[in-house]
Curated annotation (Swiss-Prot):
Source organism superkingdom: Archaea
Enzyme class label: ligase
Family: Belongs to the CarB family.
Catalytic reaction annotation: hydrogencarbonate + L-glutamine + 2 ATP + H2O = carbamoyl phosphate + L-glutamate + 2 ADP + phosphate + 2 H(+)
Cofactor details (free text): Binds 4 Mg(2+) or Mn(2+) ions per subunit.
Binding partners and assembly: Composed of two chains; the small (or glutamine) chain promotes the hydrolysis of glutamine to ammonia, which is used by the large (or ammonia) chain to synthesize carbamoyl phosphate. Tetramer of heterodimers (alpha,beta)4.
Pathway: Amino-acid biosynthesis; L-arginine biosynthesis; carbamoyl phosphate from bicarbonate: step 1/1; Pyrimidine metabolism; UMP biosynthesis via de novo pathway; (S)-dihydroorotate from bicarbonate: step 1/3
Gene3D superfamilies: 3.40.50.20, ATP-grasp fold, B domain, Carbamoyl-phosphate synthetase, large subunit oligomerisation domain, Methylglyoxal synthase-like domain
Cofactor field: Mg(2+); Mn(2+)
Region feature Carbamoyl phosphate synthetic domain, mapped onto this chain: 556-939
Binding site for Mg(2+) 2: 299, 301
Natural source organism: Archaeoglobus fulgidus (strain ATCC 49558 / DSM 4304 / JCM 9628 / NBRC 100126 / VC-16)
Protein name: Carbamoyl phosphate synthase large chain
Binding site for Mg(2+) 1: 285, 299
Length: 1076
């Protein structure tokens, strides 16, 4: 059936900020869908609150609304736009839940908007645990024994009947939020209470724990004519009990017999029909009992998901794009396969390689989080690798993670471990379990014993055993001969099993460079194979490659002039989707200039790894060895390392030493900015102030510096991204503890000590430079005071409290620095303003995480311009104009993962903790800030009770101003004794509430009972389980708005005041840009 002509305007809802469980994959699916719908001539209206996405670019839809994904605000947009249809299946759980709310509020009926892609009933049937269970019974499929509970006593009764352990799964939540595994009544009481609270309909499923069963997923698509295709099967390396987002996964499934696969395939087709997903993709999860083969259906997502992004990248089948076309009435046999151009989408993809996905965790940022993996997702990103064998793909994936490993061990990072530790690490799922399987095999543990401890299928353990045995063989050879003397076939086998040159260098006690030289001398070169959806039965038209060691190279060089762009690797805290955004913009911009673009990246969630973003895509780890192999195969004009965050910069020097040409700002200039001593010299020469500082190599040196410049000081290791291991230190005792710890982690790296400017205002600038001229992209004022990491602070553009003189000084310093560093492309500079004086904190001559936000707020596409400058264009000829004055105000706010990480203190500091960001835009700071907070999931109350408890140094005039404002706005104030005395002495009425240590009912009881609407609690700086910690943690767990800095509270009170007195404006980003 051809496309529908009765609908003209379609609204697409994005997934909002990046959180654990919902990451860049939805930018990828949303962008693909917008492109597909516009290709078909539909008018597209997009709503999403995340400015760091490609989908919110003004070019992606006819009208883009960067507004909170809040039902009332989306209802206003629907009223303004009156779309014919709403497509909610591409924005993750967020969009699905919004579609359900809008339907139930009657908004869709009122404006005659039809849900396409998935009907309301189908969403309900798949997401409501009770309805899903009934549907499975109806079609004769087995499900785990389970029952639905709406309160804790019901949950306990059900579990008693089923027997422990049980899995708790809340309805309508994402990434297992609020869920968990309970082994006894106490644990169940806690998990069920949390789960019921977090579920949109206050419902949890208590399910028989099918722990240790094998877990499989099928990616399925269906059209209106009831054609169903299976795109891909995915097998979880980790058994049931670990959330699939936290499991290592493998595609296609490796350990199913043909009969079992056919059974799952038939079951999946029955399920998608019964649930009634008329069009588009669904992800269906099964558990299979390892001994008796009993199969149970676990759950289904009636939408594009994290797994569908993986399935798309693994097979080359563009699920999101095709889902969008199916939603408007096409059938699968009418849509051509984009990669081959001659087969229709109704051909099921076949693959002749193995794909391995490994999650990336952020436990280094959250040392107090529980690191055992369970049914609630904890990873923040993932990598994918492709190889001809499981062993090769596994080692490449480990190398892609950027956790300092170059494969499965023998890379100079192995630890001495006891059998005791090994058993512990095998029994409890954790991020490094795969390394411990290797240790266990090396110590002689049998495959069967490892299986008993881990329930990981013996097939996988056998493959790891192959690596262990081969490594042993290599080590024996290395005792007898040098790498030069090793027979070629042994080296070839090592490369076929995925060993990196770095690993071989460790085994043969030589350097990576030497291994590379010998390998090439023996004629061992990598070849590239194509991902073409059809095992090479048809010719692929859009090339997408992976490396392996075979004979025939399928990536033949073209004659065009070409540029290579290095991506950002896996998402993690400190380096997220913002950098992918910059890479994609660079690709678009260079295509305009007539270059062939070559993208190198290993993150399956992103737009940069979409088969039709760049001209050629290499799905490879971003390491010196892998990048140089591609460079030699393609021989481009040069490589761009400015856009992928720290990842490409870490290998830039090595690439240059190996003969690659780095485009844009030179490696040496980057080094000046990163190297504290060289940078300080430069600032002195330019006569630009910076905070007093020193560099310590030992504890004694550190104490001496601190005495000289005076506490408080900011201490940190050199060369970091996202402020790893930074701390503000107020006394010598804390300094001693910090330095000792830091020297243990990296003894050879010096430690930087800066005078910490308390209460300074931080300001951040993104600018463009072509070596001769500088154009300021945007000046942002941070809302949180200095000491909160710039990635975690909210910021506002244009600045609201800086005077002309300060702004002119900042502009002047920015120009001087960019020219002195010979920047070609982008530079980001961070300043602190204190008592009217401007200090430079740091400069990064690369794309920063604020580039997308600034581009969205001003309408100047910074990354696109920067890419042209690197290719030799000048700002003058491109006609780029500064827009420092805007009619509107944009606020960027950070989004945090605390809800998914119990035990972590939700307090802001110099170490970055946020996973994503949102933007609020309006004509007034208060309204823009309110929208940003709402978009980040914090709905500021307009009435009710405010609890205030602050540390000693915050008991000042600002606090009094704040409290008076809250009183004027009609709030009741409650406070603990110290803060209350201070308020009352200054004539502000406040009621006393007990501290936790003073008895009951205390502040915790009030939070749990829902008697507090807003919490303002500034931390005392002590570590550990303080009362403040317990209050802040309760705020997160019970969903109460909470603020941990006075500056944040000042902004919040302005926002509340603004919303009570003025109306919020709802306008598309295109309209804002036209006005400025």
């Amino acid at each position: 059936m051809p496309k529908r002509e009765d609908i003209r305007k379609i609204m697409v809802i994005g997934s909002g900020p990046i959180v654990i469980g919902q990451a860049a994959e939805f930018d990828y699916s949303g962008s693909q869908a917008c492109k597909a719908l516009r290709e078909e001539g539909y008018e597209v209206v997009l709503v999403n609150s995340n400015p760091a996405t490609i989908m919110t670019d003004p070019e992606m839809a006819d009208r883009v609304y960067i507004e909170p994904l809040d039902a009332e605000i989306v209802a206003k947009i629907i009223e303004r736009e009156t779309p014919d249809a709403l497509l909610p299946t591409l924005g993750g759980q967020t969009a699905l839940n919004l579609a359900v709310q809008l339907t139930e509020m009657g908004v869709l009926d009122k404006y005659g908007v039809e849900l396409i892609g998935a009907k309301f009933e189908a969403i309900k049937k798949a997401e409501d645990r009770e309805l899903f269970k009934e549907a499975m019974r109806k079609i004769g499929l087995d499900v785990p024994k389970s029952d639905v509970a709406h309160d804790v006593s019901e949950a306990l009764a059900i579990a008693d009947e089923i027997g422990y352990p049980v899995v708790v799964r809340p309805a309508f939540t994402l990434g297992g939020t609020g869920g968990g595994i309970a082994y006894n009544r106490e644990e169940l009481r806690e998990i069920a209470e949390r789960g019921i609270k977090m579920s949109m309909i206050n419902q949890v499923l208590i399910e028989e724990g099918v722990l240790g069963w094998k877990e499989f997923e099928l990616e399925v698509m269906r059209d209106l004519a009831d054609n169903v295709v299976i795109i891909c099967s995915i097998e979880n390396f980790d058994p049931m009990g670990v959330h699939t987002g936290d499991s290592i996964t493998v595609a296609p499934a490796q350990t199913l017999t043909d009969v079992e696969y056919q059974y799952l395939r038939d079951a999946a087709i029955k399920i998608i029909r019964e649930i009634g997903v008329e069009t588009g993709g669904s992800n269906i999860q099964f558990a299979v009992h390892p001994e008796n083969g009993r199969v149970v259906a676990i759950e289904m997502n009636p939408r594009v998901s994290r797994s569908s992004a993986l399935a798309s990248k693994a097979t080359g089948f563009p699920i999101a794009k095709i889902a969008a076309k199916l939603a408007v009435g096409y059938t699968l046999d009418e849509i051509p396969n984009d990669i081959t151009k001659e087969t229709p989408a109704s051909f099921e993809p076949t693959i002749d390689y193995v794909v391995v996905k490994i999650p990336r965790f952020a436990f280094d940022k959250f040392p107090t989080a529980n690191q055992v993996l369970g049914s609630q997702m904890k990873s923040v990103g993932e990598v994918m690798a492709v190889g001809r064998t499981f062993e090769e793909a596994l080692q490449k994936a480990i190398r892609s993670l950027e956790i300092g490993r170059y494969g499965l061990g023998c890379d100079g990072k192995d630890k001495e471990v006891t059998m005791e530790e090994i058993r512990e690490r095998l029994r409890y799922p954790n991020a490094s379990r795969v390394f411990y399987i290797r240790y266990a095999l090396q110590k002689g543990m049998s495959v069967n014993e490892i299986y008993e401890l881990t329930k990981i299928d013996p097939w996988f353990i056998d493959k790891i055993k192959n690596l262990v045995e081969f490594e042993e063989q290599l080590k024996q050879i290395a005792e007898r001969m040098s790498i030069e003397e090793v027979p070629k076939e042994i080296l070839k086998k090592a490369k076929e099993l995925g060993y990196s040159d770095r690993q071989l260098a460790v085994i043969f006690n030589t350097t990576e460079r030497e291994v590379r030289r010998v390998r090439k001398g023996k004629g061992l070169r990598v070849v590239y194979k194509m991902v073409d959806t059809c095992a090479a039965e048809f010719e692929a038209k859009t090339p997408y490659y992976y490396s392996t060691y075979e004979d025939e190279n399928e990536a033949l060089r073209s004659e065009r002039k070409k540029v290579m762009i290095l991506g950002a690797g896996p998402n993690r805290i400190g380096q997220g989707i913002e950098f992918d955004y910059c890479c994609v913009h660079a690709v678009f911009s260079l295509k305009d200039e007539g270059y062939e673009t070559i993208m190198v990246n290993c993150n399956p969630e992103t737009v940069s790894t979409d088969y039709d973003t760049s001209d050629r895509l290499y799905f490879e780890p971003i390491t010196h060895e892998d990048v140089m192999n591609i460079y030699e195969n393609e021989q481009p004009e040069g490589v761009i390392v400015q856009f992928g965050g720290q990842t490409p910069l870490n290998i830039a020097r090595e690439l240059e030493d190996s003969g690659a040409r780095i485009l844009g700002t030179s490696v040496d200039s980057i080094d000046i900015a990163e190297d504290r001593e060289r940078f300080a010299e430069l600032l002195e020469r330019l006569n630009i102030p910076q905070p007093e500082n020193g560099i310590a190599h030992s504890l004694e040196e550190a104490k001496e510096i601190a005495r000289k410049i005076g506490f408080p000081v900011l201490v940190r290791p050199s060369y970091v991204l996202g402020g790893r291991a930074m701390e503000i230190v107020y006394d010598e005792e804390t300094l001693e503890r910090y330095i000792t710890e830091a020297l243990e982690v990296s003894p050879e790296k010096p430690i930087l000590i800066d005078k910490f400017l308390e209460d300074a205002i931080e300001v951040e600038v993104d600018a463009l430079c072509d070596g001769e001229e500088v154009v300021i992209g945007g000046i942002m004022e941070h809302i949180e005071e200095a000491g909160v990491h710039s990635g975690d602070s909210a910021c506002v553009l244009p600045p609201v409290s800086l005077d002309e003189v300060t702004i002119n000084t900042i502009v002047d310093y920015t120009r001087k620095l960019a020219l002195a560093l010979n920047v070609v492309g982008l530079i980001n500079i961070q300043y602190a303003v204190k008592d009217g004086k401007v200090y430079v904190l740091e400069a990064n001559p690369r794309a920063s995480r604020t580039v997308p936000f600034v581009s969205k707020a001003t309408g100047i596409p910074l990354a696109k311009i920067a890419a042209k400058l690197m290719m030799g264009k000048k700002l003058r000829e491109l006609g780029v104009k500064e827009k420092l004055k805007l009619k509107h105000v944009a606020v960027k706010e950070a989004v945090f993962p605390f809800i998914k990480l119990p035990g972590v203190d939700p307090v802001l500091g110099p170490e970055m903790k946020s996973t994503g960001e949102v933007m609020g835009i309006d004509y007034d700071f208060g309204l823009a800030y309110y929208k940003a907070e709402l978009a980040a999931g914090m709905k500021l109350p307009l009435k009710g009770t405010v609890f205030i408890s602050v540390r000693r140094k915050d008991k000042n005039d600002r606090l009094l101003y704040l409290a008076r404002k809250f009183k004027e706005l009609g709030f009741r104030i409650i406070a603990t004794d110290g803060t209350r005395d201070f308020l009352v002495q200054n004539g502000i009425e406040a009621d006393l509430i007990l501290k936790i240590s003073q008895g009951r009912p205390n502040i915790l009881d009030a939070i749990v009972n829902g008697q507090v609407d807003l919490i303002i609690n500034t931390p005392s700086g002590k570590r550990g389980r303080t009362e403040g910690y317990m209050i802040r943690r309760a705020a997160v767990d019970y969903g109460v708005a909470h603020i941990t800095t006075l500056a944040g509270a000042m902004a919040a009170v302005r926002a509340i005041e603004a919303v009570k007195s003025r109306k919020m404006v709802v306008k598309s980003i295109q309209e804002y840009h036209e006005e400025s």
